[in-house]
A protein has these predicted regions:
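S-adenosyl-L-methionine
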Residues: 1-17
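Conserved acidic-Pro-Pro-aromatic motif
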Residues: 13-131
Length: 131
């Protein structure tokens, strides 16, 4: 194995450069630390124009807390599948059948404040149908 040092910056530093008049899509995949990062920043309180893609690990005890936090800030949740987006009312991360691991079939979840009509319209244009 080789160790490579990389520089990092706090998530809050990225957020300060966001223009409130533009729309953004932010993908966060920090191996189970999504709740800690999102709840420790002002992203949900200050930005109305940010959609999020978050990975939910099946064994993460913070999944429900993160899901509920985003719902309470006015986001709708959609499970991202090969067939398109499925609206969620609770986290629908599904374990792979007959495999002993933390891997899942679907782990990415799309959170948005856009209307369900607009999400379905975009889904239909990109995928061809709505689930």
């Amino acid at each position: 194995y080789e160790t490579i040092e990389v520089s990092t910056i706090p998530f809050s530093s990225v957020l300060k450069d966001i223009n409130p008049k533009k729309n953004y899509l932010i993908k966060i995949d920090v191996e189970g630390w999504e709740y800690k990062i999102i709840s420790s920043t002002k992203i949900l309180e200050t930005l109305k124009n940010v959609d999020l893609i978050l990975e939910f690990n099946i064994n993460n005890p913070f999944n429900n807390k993160l899901f509920n936090l985003l719902i309470n800030f006015g986001y709708d949740s959609y499970l991202m599948t090969n067939k398109g987006l499925i609206k969620e009312f609770k986290p629908l991360t599904i374990p792979k059948p007959k495999i002993k691991s933390s891997r899942t079939i679907w782990r990415n979840h799309f959170f948005t404040k856009k209307s369900e009509y607009l999400v379905n319209k975009i889904n239909k244009e990109k995928i061809g149908y709505v689930i």
